[in-house]
UniProtKB/Swiss-Prot annotation:
GO terms for biological process: cell wall organization; microtubule-based movement; mitotic spindle organization; spindle elongation. The lineage of its organism: Eukaryota, Viridiplantae, Streptophyta, Embryophyta, Tracheophyta. Homodimer. Composed of an N-terminal domain which is responsible for the motor activity of kinesin (it hydrolyzes ATP and binds microtubule) and a central to C-terminal alpha-helical coiled coil domain that mediates the heavy chain dimerization. This is Kinesin-like protein KIN-4A. It comes from Gossypium hirsutum (Upland cotton). Pfam families: Kinesin.
Length: 1033
């Protein structure tokens, strides 16, 4: 492959991807120490600020990075430019997630899957104009060995080698070697390149290689990549060109242009520290090789990124590792490169994050020279065609002869014939493609299916012909048939509608008839009823008429008689009528009176009933009120009891909170003092280191000036070298001191974060509801605090965590600067100022003397430590003896208490006359020594044996003052008690005073031992100092 086209320099584009805090970092209480400036591609950590081409924070979308950084590289790939995407950063910073090398099951997460989609989408749009061929390869560099992840033989061996991630030796297959062609292109001899034509095939290759890649678990990452992986996509394209003829018209002849470009997608293994990852054995060796390759990459970036070195033509150490050798074109060569720096925002990773940002900032200065990669033959043909066109144009301008015109016509005829032949060739090629496709289908299916497919095709063709004939014959009748079908369909719909309506009418008619039958039955019954009534009325009418006729007959008979009798009868009837009318009036009055009485009675009954109802209602209300009063009283009693109980609990809680508050205040104050002291120590160490680093430059210049002087300044030069060596050693010690303070501060922050996590967990559990038990001691300890105390403690811990995080970031910055200066100083040469062998010998002699003095001091310190250990052993032995004596004294005190209790009980009952002399004799007969209680004098704690030597020595010094009290006679004890105004002198006066003395004490038997101890102490304090017996140690 040969490069063509004009080359233009372009810088390496750098993008920074800040991942969010992960779960483990949140549990540890890590704070975000990286700040992304809104609206600007800037990132800030501590006092350092960096500007890059692109910065993506934790809230940025992954599609933004692809659209802004990767899409231009994919477009350039179709133009023939090589491209490289490089993911660099600390272990666990999200490089594999960002690149997408952990491809599984069609996942679209990461840059590589998006690149594949964009590639095939663009190929689909251009496949009618350009012929494409795609090849992929996938390798990894594990422990400086290149492994092919797409090799089938390697895949068969990968399962057996999964326990050991070392080199897999495949029989009969040579190892992959890195070669460089004559034109400077880096190639891999022996690697597998797979041709792919679909997105699915390329995804299968990526997934296959991802599963074969070496991974492992560390303390910082469960799925840590243990190798550098490079996924390469090679795009070959054949472009067809239409050259222009000499007369300016487009020529029919076709020419081809072959372009080949590569896209390297590099997922580097993360830099790691063995102390933090906790790796050992095989993991440790892998980490060493990873850091070695990244160090070589950093040296290459430093050499290419320094403009001064680049102008001076300083050697670039590409050959220091296989990683830099493979990335030789990507860094400073024929490629467009984008470097993605993945960083962690956690303050615990501040040092590694700062180093990553410095490397990325240095990589921005690297200048690449990308060019279009063309085939040598096509490039030469293109040049010759351009030259031919130029000559033809010049010939036409000068006016050619007739022979030239004939030749031009012949050329045009030949080109037309060539074009016809090309068309025929294209048709034949398309037919061959169809035939090949049919052959593939025939191979996939059975002969019967192939034959049936052919018959079906023939049948379809004949049916199509028949259909065409029928359409031509009955084309005119089709409209009439369609109209008849439409009318028939409309009639059917109308008929169905009318049937439905008829059915509905029938149903309604049946309902009305049934209603009429019901109404007819009622009419007959009414006719019968009213007929009977009419007959009854007619009978009554006839009876009344008969009565009337009879009365008229009587009247006629009477009128026919004499008038006297008529008058007499008339008078009689008149009197009877008057009497009857008088009776009727009386009856009416009585009836009215009865009616009034009935009304009054009804009113009184209603009033009585109303009163009775009111009485019942009042009684019910009375019962309800009594029941309610009882309930209210019970509720008030319960409420009062609960309030009193709550008041007691609140008082108790208040006392406990007050105690906890004082305790937490003391703890916070102590932790703040410790944290402040450690922060001040760290600040002093970093300040001292900074001053030493600044002084190193001036000292180096002074030493260089002294070294360039004449020979008379030999003594001065020697002293200067000695001062320079002392200064370098002091710088090294201070760097170690700052590193030690950094580790201590990390441990303190981890402890604070653990306590904060426990308290937040307890707070969350309490907010959800009280839990029956706590699984961990930390949770139990956190649950013992009250909510207010817990909130105060959480706030204090968060404040201290903030201080600790700021201190960690500051120390990480100083350590990074110190390491960078040390690396730069080491690269320039530490011993360049040694100008002669004599200076080297003098400096070596000085170093030997200093080392001897250090060894002597170390030997003396070792002797002192051994002596102190022996003293500590003796003190621990004495302490154990004192503890044994203390236990014996406690046993003796228990025996004495039991004896005193028996004596008191016996004296109180009067059953047995036991005097104090028997107790005195019992005490005299005891041979075990009695000492002053250690709990009061020494503040004894069970763990004092494991305490520091200073406390042990103080304890032994106090035990020397202990007195064998049991050896003293009771008379001396009594006398001493009397002299010291004690209470034992009253015991010997009489039995009555004995009882009086113990009367109120015996009411509290649990304080008897305390009272006896207090009496013993009083006696001991009252003894003269000359009589005190001490132990000799």
């Amino acid at each position: 492959m040969e490069v063509g086209g004009g080359s233009e320099e372009c810088c390496v584009k750098v993008a920074v991807h800040v991942r969010p805090l992960i779960g483990d970092e949140k549990v540890q209480g890590c704070k975000d120490c990286v700040t992304v400036i809104p609206g600007k591609p800037q990132v800030q950590i501590g006092t350092h600020s960096f500007t890059f081409d692109h910065v993506y924070g934790s809230t940025s979308s992954p599609s933004w990075m692809f659209e802004e950084c990767i899409v231009p590289l994919v477009d350039g790939l179709f133009q023939g430019y090589n491209a490289t995407v490089l993911a660099y950063g600390q272990t666990g910073s999200g490089k594999t997630y960002t690149m997408g090398t952990g491809f599984k099951g069609g996942s679209q997460t990461g840059i590589i899957p998006q690149v594949m989609n964009a590639l095939f989408s663009k190929i689909e749009n251009l496949k009618h104009q350009i012929e494409f061929q795609l090849h992929v390869s996938f390798i990894e560099i594990l422990k400086e060995e290149v492994r092919d992840l797409l090799d089938p033989t390697f895949l068969n061996k990968s399962d057996t080698a999964s326990a050991n991630t070392g080199k897999v030796n495949v029989p009969g297959k040579p190892p992959i070697q890195i070669r460089e062609s004559s034109d400077g292109v880096i190639t891999l001899a022996g690697s597998t390149e797979v041709s792919v034509s679909t997105l699915k095939e390329m995804g299968a290759c990526l997934e296959q290689g991802s599963l074969s890649r070496a991974t492992g678990s560390t303390n910082m990452n469960n799925q840590s990549s243990r190798s550098h992986a490079i996924f390469t996509i090679t795009l070959e394209q054949m472009r067809k060109l239409n050259p222009v003829s000499g007369d300016g018209n487009p020529n029919d002849s076709m020419s081809e242009e072959y372009l080949c470009a590569k896209l390297h997608l590099v997922d580097l293994a993360g830099s790691e520290r063995a102390k933090r990852t906790g790796s050992d054995g095989m993991r440790f060796k892998e980490g060493v090789h990873i850091n070695k390759g990244l160090l070589a990459l950093g040296n290459v970036i430093s050499a290419l990124g320094d403009e001064k070195k680049r102008k001076e033509g300083v050697h670039v150490p590409y050959r220091d590792s296989k990683l830099t050798r493979l990335l030789q074109d990507s860094l400073g060569g024929n490629s467009r490169t984008v470097m993605i720096a993945c960083i962690s925002p956690a303050d615990i990773n501040a040092e590694e994050t700062l180093n990553t940002l410095k490397y990325a900032n240095r990589a921005r200065n690297i200048q690449n020279k990308p060019v279009v990669n063309r085939d040598p033959m096509s490039n030469e043909i293109l040049k010759m065609r351009q030259q031919l066109e130029y000559l033809q144009a010049e010939l036409c301008a000068r006016g050619g002869s007739g022979e030239v015109q004939v030749l031009n016509e012949r050329i045009a005829w030949l080109e037309a014939a060539n074009e016809d032949l090309c068309r025929e060739l294209y048709e034949y090629r398309s037919r061959c493609t169809i035939v090949e496709q049919r052959e593939m289908d025939a191979q996939d299916g059975s002969p019967c299916s192939v034959e049936s497919d052919g018959l079906k095709r023939n049948l379809r063709s004949r049916e199509s012909r028949d259909n065409q004939i029928v359409e031509t014959m009955i084309g005119g009748d089709s409209r009439e048939i369609e109209e008849g079908a439409a009318k028939e369909w409309e009639h059917m719909l109308l008929q169905n509608t009318m049937d439905k309506e008829l059915h509905e009418l029938n149903r309604q008619l049946e309902e009305k008839e049934s209603e009429m039958k019901v109404f007819g039955g009622h009419t007959v019954a009414l006719k019968q009823h009213f007929g009977k009534k009419i007959q009854e009325l007619e009978e009554e009418k006839r009876a009344v008429q008969q009565e009337r006729d009879r009365l008229l007959a009587e009247i006629e008979n009477l009128s026919a008689g004499s008038e006297g009798q008529a008058l007499k009868v008339h008078d009689i009837h008149a009197q009877k009528l008057k009497s009857l009318e008088a009776q009727i009036m009386d009856l009416k009055k009585k009836q009215e009176n009865q009616v009034q009485l009935l009304k009054k009675k009804q009113k009184s009954d209603e009033a009585a009933k109303r009163l009775q109802d009111e009485i019942q209602y009042i009684k019910a209300q009375k019962v309800q009120l009594q029941h309610r009063i009882k309930q209210e009283a019970e509720q008030f009693r319960q409420w009062k009891a609960s309030r009193e109980k709550e008041l007691l609990q609140l008082r108790k809680e208040g006392r406990r909170n007050e105690y906890e508050r004082h305790k937490l205040q003391a703890l916070n104050q102590r932790q703040k003092l410790v944290l402040q002291r450690k922060t001040e120590e760290a600040a002093m160490a970093t300040k001292r280191l900074k001053e030493l680093l600044e002084a190193r430059k001036s000292a180096a210049r002074d030493n260089l000036a002294i070294a360039n002087g004449n020979g008379t300044n030999g003594k001065i030069n020697e002293k200067g070298l000695q001062r320079w060596l002392d200064h370098e050693l002091e710088v090294m010690v201070n760097v170690h001191e700052v590193r030690f303070e950094y580790e201590k501060q990390s441990q303190v922050r981890a402890a604070l974060a653990e306590e904060l996590a426990v308290l937040k967990q307890v707070d969350e559990l309490d907010s959800k509801g009280p839990s029956p038990s706590r699984g961990k001691n930390g949770c139990a300890r956190g649950s013992s605090l009250s909510p207010n105390a817990r909130v105060a403690r959480i706030s204090s811990l968060e404040h201290m965590l903030g201080i600790s995080s700021n201190s960690l970031v500051a120390m990480a910055s100083q350590l990074s600067e110190a390491e960078e200066r040390e690396r730069a100083f080491t690269n320039r040469g530490r011993w360049n100022q040694l100008r002669s062998m004599g200076d080297a010998k003098n400096l070596l002699q000085y170093m030997f003397n200093s080392l001897g003095d250090s060894r002597y001091q170390l030997w003396e310190k070792g002797i002192e430590i051994r002596e102190m250990k022996e003293q500590l052993k003796e003190l621990v032995g004495l302490l154990r003896q004192s503890e044994l004596q203390r236990k014996e004294v406690e046993n003796e005190l228990k025996l004495r208490e039991q004896a005193v209790a028996i004596a008191l009980a016996t004296s109180a009952t009067g059953n047995s006359p036991i005097s104090l002399k028997h107790i005195d004799d019992d005490v005299k007969s005891s041979s075990s020594p009695m000492s002053v209680p250690a709990q009061k004098q020494l503040k004894y704690s069970p763990g004092i044996v494991n305490g520091p030597a200073r406390e042990s020595a103080a304890f032994i010094g106090q035990t020397r003052k202990m007195i064998p009290l049991g050896q003293l006679p009771m008379k001396n004890l009594v006398a001493n008690g009397q002299a010291g105004n004690g209470k034992l002198w009253r015991w010997k006066r009489s039995h009555h005073q004995w009882l009086v003395q113990f009367k109120w004490k015996w009411q509290k038997p649990w304080r008897l031992s305390e009272w006896i101890r207090h009496s013993d102490e009083t006696i001991i304090r009252a003894r003269p100092r000359s009589q005190v017996l001490t132990y000799r140690v």
